[in-house]
Amino acid sequence: MSGWRKIYYKLLNLPLKLLVRSKVIPSDPVTELGLDPSRPILYVLPYNSKADLLTLRTQCLAQDLPDPLNPLEIDGTVLPSHVFIHDGPRVFRYYTPKEESVKLFHDYLDLHRSNPDLDIQMLPVSVMFGRSPGREGHGTPHLRLLNGVQKFFAVLWLGRDSFVRFSNTVSLRRMATEHGTDKIIAQKLARVARMHFSRQRLAAVGPSLPARQDLFNKLLASKAIEKAVEDEARSKKISHEKAQQNAIALMEEIAADFSYETVRLSDRVLSWTWNRLYQGINVTNAERVRQLAQDGHEIVYVPCHRSHMDYLLLSYVLYHQGLVPPHIAAGINLNFWPAGPIFRRLGAFFIRRTFKGNKLYSTVFREYLGELFTRGYSVEYFVEGGRSRTGRLLEPKTGTLSMTIQAMLRGGSRPITLVPIYIGYEHVMEVGTYAKELRGATKEKESLLQMLRGLRKLRNLGQGYVNFGDPLPLTAYLNQNVPQWRESIDPIEAQRPSWLTPTVNDLAAKIMVRINNAAAANAMNLCSTALLASRQRSLTREQLLEQLECYLQLMRNVPYAGDVTVPTQTPDELLDHALNMNKFEVEKDNIGDIIILPREQAVLMTYYRNNIHHLLVLPSLIATIVMHHRRVSRAELLRQIGLIYPMLKAELFLHNDKEQLPEVLRPLIDEMIRQQLICDKGDDLVLNPARIRPLQLLAAGVRETLQRYAITMSILSANPSINRGALEKESRIMAQRLSVLHGINAPEFFDKAVFSTLVATLRAEGYINDIGDAVREHTMEVYNMLSDLITPEIKLTIESVSMPAETNALPETVAAEEKED
């Protein structure tokens, strides 16, 4: 590079250093994209811009990548290490790759022909200043060109809202070997690069925004809403104009009013907020979503729902991953001033809790959702319907998912892909409120005052986690499970084919399983699990560290699922981090530290334990069975786990089927033997007295679950003809009684939804027959097994309440007592 050019770039770089603070996507391109800085890199940019080139250079130097301003010298040939696919603001050359780029590609390909050891990495990079999608009708292309003046103002105004996006490399060696090195291949390479950048920009910016009134007019003109308006006028005996006004009012209530400027402002506020409140936001598998967006998929984000913070956190994360924030289905309870208007401009559209009895509302909402898909907007909704009060996944609500399938049946939309997302926190700001609600307190209505009270309490929230799970492409799913689904496509009428409900239910279950498959273990949920396992809610520092090591080794050596994230820190580091969260107390004496979970915190900490309960439930069950029997054969262990596994699978959305248990249990048992928690005696597994403490703590993780199952099986065995509603109610009442008598500090222990799921599973598994009666020999088999795994005190309390209902239905223990009397 000549001296004058160096001076020119240095002068140009001065204002850029002051004005530009770009983000890198992905955050660690060398590792995430598998770049090799020791091999030559050819940087490919979409169009000629010195500001883009210097912004790229700054990030390359920060990432220890080769300087794009330094030319490459290969076999005596000197070539620039960057190339622009298009010239600058000359619009007439926009659609044709400029000759210089084609020539440079050809020169590089030609070098590979003469040098078989050469392999240059072609690295596409896009630099974006601002992400305004523009308004419909303005004709702004997705790969727009800015002249010098426009670029100056873009850098001045949007320099801190810019990002440098590195894409996967293309091996020029592979291109030369597979496709040749002539000029036609170079032209194709330039054309493919142009298409790549155009798609990438669309994924980052999204489609142009419609004028709100134009959108409403289009919806009103749809056949479905026209018919619903006519039905509204006829059923309510009002004029057609009045019915149409009702429809418009519903659109005003529902529809988002997306504003890029609001998103940009909120990004600054949220960046300050996250940095102040959280010690880090950990994002995993975002590249999956970036690739889906770039491949043209219509993305539906389906996260679990822990907190009102979820709405903001996920949009913030997606924005920082170079993706357009989605339109979010938010509960109508959040449509209060000032939150409602702000959320609406951030992309929220509002949904009522129920559609029943309001055909006009359901039609307007369904058509609006379908219009979002047709226009190509990404959408987000919480498949659980509401925030989990217990820390576990809730039974899915399938209404919006059903409408998503119906949107596909309108035809014409891009391929829709569901992306499950696990959101986790080390501190959920509403957790205290959740505990009160589970104890029976009335849910407080959302308001400005409540929001301000919540914000006042926010501090030291630890880490946040956003893990993108395994995507579920709807077209592929329907092709496999409902081959005839295209026969139901109707662009006018909303379809409800016979296969819709079972298909939606199966899809919902798969989504929940994939959310759990992407869970995040962290310092808070691991420490909470260990301390809650101790009956006194306290452990010495050494005992707690030993237990953390046990959990970590199980999760690392026998991963629950490929997408689960496990901390890389040592137990000491995790404990120190958890103690800094000020949830636990430390008592010091001459012997050492004792870590205590205060009584008032115990109920709240069950929330975090429940986030990862499914990850440890099978090791806990193995530990329980070995500990109570002291010696058990592998076959008997498998039989006992097999009896209750369907209930665990339904309750915790476990991903393995019962038939897979032998393959699932084998590595877990081997790991527990390796940790010397149990001993291998041929076909038998034996308790190891030297490691009884960690085994007891591991076993305690499933203690309350087994007690709940024992309650229901006991009632069902004593009264086989009890109806479903009464069974759920009596189980809940007895669980509350046990909670009081035995100090069980887990709100979900008597949660209505948990017992409802259990009873539904018992029916599905044949414990309750078609006429609603229990098959007593089956329920007794399970109860007798469970009664060996719970403490005598708990067993006595259960049997003293449930068993007198019918003498001939009593277990042997109680029947014997009555005979003696």
UniProtKB/Swiss-Prot annotation:
A GO term from the CC aspect: plasma membrane
Pathway this chain belongs to: Phospholipid metabolism; CDP-diacylglycerol biosynthesis; CDP-diacylglycerol from sn-glycerol 3-phosphate: step 1/3
GO terms (BP aspect): CDP-diacylglycerol biosynthetic process; fatty acid metabolic process
Pfam families, per the entry: Acyltransferase (PF01553), GPAT_C (PF19277)
Superkingdom, natural source: Bacteria
GO MF assignments: glycerol-3-phosphate O-acyltransferase activity
Motif HXXXXD motif, chain ranges: 304-309
InterPro entries, per the entry: GPAT/DHAPAT (IPR022284), GPAT/DHAPAT_C (IPR045520), GPAT/DHAPAT_LPLAT (IPR041728), GPAT_PlsB (IPR028354), Plipid/glycerol_acylTrfase (IPR002123)
Alphabetically ordered keywords of this record: Acyltransferase, Cell inner membrane, Cell membrane, Lipid biosynthesis, Lipid metabolism, Membrane, Phospholipid biosynthesis, Phospholipid metabolism, Transferase
Top EC class of this enzyme: transferase
Membrane topology, as annotated: Peripheral membrane protein
Catalytic activity: sn-glycerol 3-phosphate + an acyl-CoA = a 1-acyl-sn-glycero-3-phosphate + CoA
Family: Belongs to the GPAT/DAPAT family.
Note on domains (UniProt): The HXXXXD motif is essential for acyltransferase activity and may constitute the binding site for the phosphate moiety of the glycerol-3-phosphate.
Entry protein name: Glycerol-3-phosphate acyltransferase
